[in-house]
Amino acid sequence: QKIKDCDWVIEVIVERLDIKQQLFEKVERHRTAGSLISSNTSGIPIHMMLEGRSEDFQKHFCGTHFFNPPRYLQLLEIIPTPKTDNDVVDFLMDYGSKILGKKTVLCKDTPAFIANRVGVYSIMALFHAVKEMGFSVSEVDKLSGPILGRPKSATFRTCDVVGLDTLVHVANGLKQNCLDDEERELFELPDYISKM
């Protein structure tokens, strides 16, 4: 019920559309009209979360994908839907950069947006190469970190920080929502990932 006093509610729960929709139904019952609502989803298309929501909710709803851990990582993707009010988008872009000190990027509402579409593709390609070439976890992280100009957390440590469950949900979402992608099969999880 304290949600009614909030200017901005950011959803940060498991990467499952059904659970997010259930939460937004509860949030809508208690929020004040005009308050901002956003999702920190890593890859679920933003418009899919709006089913059953009021016009006011839809106008004030946007994706705000903060990269994890947000206290260290600069990127913030702002993902409006066609129903998001332009003033909300302008506010989030401005607040994200000037107040939060983030590098804000305006994204289209496509599966996994920009960074995770590229990043998860890269990780999945590497996962398949690991299976084919028999690399160990430590070998992969040595070869896919600073030596390539990437963070020292490299691949497997990054997946551990973000959460392997999140990666699995995003990869599955890409496979499910990118039916015409010529490399769609790359998002099929190797067996060893399911065992981790």
Where are these regions (language model features)?
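N-terminal glycine-rich phosphate-binding loop for ADP-containing cofactors
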Residues: Q1-M196
